[in-house]
Amino acid sequence: MRSPYKKSKAAYICVWCLVLLLIVFIWLRNKSAFLPSVISTLIAILLGFFTSRLLENIISNTETTKRLGYLHMEMDPEKFISSYIDIPKKTTGDKEKMISYAYLSSGYEAAGDFDRALETLEKGNINGSDSLDTLYLSQKCRCLIEKGILDEAEDVLKELEKRIDSITGNQSLKDNQRQVQYVLSEMLRAKKGDSVDVEYLEGRLKATQYRIGRLEIYYTIAMHYRNKENKKKEMETLSIIREEGGNTWFRKWAEERLDEI
């Protein structure tokens, strides 16, 4: 995989420039020793290859993490989108490209642009791997629920459940995706006007690392209380969403709902 980030490419080029200088130095120093020069050159090339790839990957991961922080920590989807929108097109490799499109899709989803989130998600190619298939299906289901296309969301949720059941040899992934699937099923139930397992969802709040994920759960709980016509609890939950929602659609939705009550 070649990194889509300019800093990574610059580091890659710098490493190989140093390697070329080292090779020139080796041959100038050992003009009369052909075999040692060849061996030293091969070692320098191998060293350059592994060093450049390692440095490129480190910088690429750092840049991706920084940009995802705009979304998951700063709760600013527009800032994330503007910094990441060109990355998927520059990414090589089907797996990496699918992941990058899923990241961008989550940015559009957090901004409330569900059509673009779904459109962006479909640009990636799932390749039958457990992690990519479940990533694609869970993100698609989430967008469909939030957009209000509930029948299709239910079909995708069933497909996700079957795909999770088929996972073998990676119990950690299976358990994690099972939790994701259950939260989505509760969101779908709340969206349909049914009751949800609030106790379970409140437990998931404590275990959810990212703030976007917490908003998703609060959103489900708020809809549950709305369905139950428990205005006091609903307003308490909406107030939390308004306070923690940053620049996401969750906050705007909570503000509009609070104005209605």
Language-model features: locations:
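Residue-level signature for tetratricopeptide repeat
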Residues: G69-M73, K90, G107, C143, ...
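N-terminal alpha-helical membrane-insertion module
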Residues: M1-P77
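Helix-turn-helix repeat elements of alpha-solenoid scaffolds
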Residues: P36-L42, G69-I85, S106-L121, I149-K162, ...
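N-terminal topogenic membrane-targeting module
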Residues: G48-N127
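Solenoid-like repeat scaffolds
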Residues: T51-N57, I85-E96, E122-S131, K158-K174, ...
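Long, non-transmembrane cytosolic or organellar matrix-exposed soluble domains/tails
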Residues: A190-I261
